[in-house]
């Protein structure tokens, strides 16, 4: 059976653990190597036991620990070519970096990882679907400016999903952010609102997803209760809904 946890989720850092049997992988490596090691340890996983890290995009909150993990643990790092080029420009140097097309499939132990494109203001942003040998799967998709067909297709056949619920539109518009930052977040390559997340969640449940986690919540423009209530109102009551903690592990499925 596949297990998935958000280690932490938000602008201060993002990382998720997916494991099945003896195989464990990370999706992103934000925050610090020590923070990731501590979070993994609380779940009974040692950092050197992680087989691979799959990077969604090059923004700091998703790669903060990447260079140190690659250097000290020698863990293989997988990224799209565009993201790999961006990592090189950010002086990430490592012989463990594996470059892939935007859409690719990679097997790691008894897990299979498939990427799909997402709309965000980065070099080549992707989400991931991870499945075990029985086909049990989880979809992980954050940092997207609008709902896209690639995401809706990717969720097909998954049992769980981690979806972005970044902001409440009214809180963002009336909040303290400068105009340029509000425009970026609300743009088609910005971040997904609670309302749009609810639409994705409703569709996901129609596909058969039974475990939903809300991630990448803005600390200034959202609250866990507001995100939860907005999405909860759109989905069946028997679907397990959780909000990812910013600083501690949260079980997704």
Task: Report the location of each language-model feature.
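Cap/insert and terminal regions of metallo-dependent hydrolase folds
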Residues: 149-245
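Active-site neighborhood of phospho(di)ester-bond hydrolases with catalytic His/Asp-centered motifs
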Residues: 27-30, 51-58, 78-81, 139-142, ...
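Metal-dependent catalytic neighborhoods of phosphoester/phosphodiester hydrolases
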Residues: 64-73, 89-90, 222-229
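Metallo-beta-lactamase
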Residues: 81-135
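Active-site environment of divalent metal-dependent phosphoester hydrolases
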Residues: 59-63, 84-86, 122-123, 146-149, ...
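Conserved beta-strand hairpin/beta-sheet module of binuclear metal-dependent hydrolase folds
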Residues: 1-43, 126-143, 160
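Active-site metal-binding motif and surrounding structural segment of the metallo-beta-lactamase
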Residues: 33-79
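Structured catalytic core of nucleotide-sugar glycosyltransferases
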Residues: 5-15, 56-66, 84, 88, ...
């Amino acid at each position: 059976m596949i297990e998935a946890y958000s280690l932490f989720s938000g602008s201060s850092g993002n990382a998720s653990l997916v494991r099945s049997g003896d195989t464990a992988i990370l999706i992103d490596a934000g925050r610090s190597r020590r923070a990731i090691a501590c979070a993994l340890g609380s779940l009974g996983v040692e950092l050197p036991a992680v087989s691979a890290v799959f990077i969604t995009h090059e923004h700091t909150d998703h790669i903060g620990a990447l260079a140190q993990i690659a250097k000290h643990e020698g863990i293989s790092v997988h990224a799209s070519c565009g993201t790999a080029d961006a990592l090189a420009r950010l002086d990430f140097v490592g012989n463990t970096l594996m470059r892939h097309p935007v859409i690719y499939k990679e097997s790691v132990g008894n897990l299979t990882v498939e990427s799909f494109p997402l709309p965000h203001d980065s070099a080549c942003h992707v989400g991931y679907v991870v499945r075990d040998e029985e086909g049990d799967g989880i979809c992980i998709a954050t940092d997207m400016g609008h709902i896209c067909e690639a995401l809706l297709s990717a969720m097909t056949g998954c049992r769980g999903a981690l979806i972005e619920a970044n902001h409440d539109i009214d809180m963002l518009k009336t909040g303290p952010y400068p105009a340029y930052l509000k425009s970026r977040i609300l743009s088609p390559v910005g971040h997904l609102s609670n309302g749009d997340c609810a639409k994705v969640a409703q569709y996901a449940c129609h596909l058969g997803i039974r475990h939903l986690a809300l991630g990448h919540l803005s600390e200034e423009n959202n609250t866990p209760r507001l995100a939860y209530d907005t999405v909860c109102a759109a989905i069946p009551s028997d679907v397990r809904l959780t909000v990812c903690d910013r600083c501690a592990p949260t079980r997704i499925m």
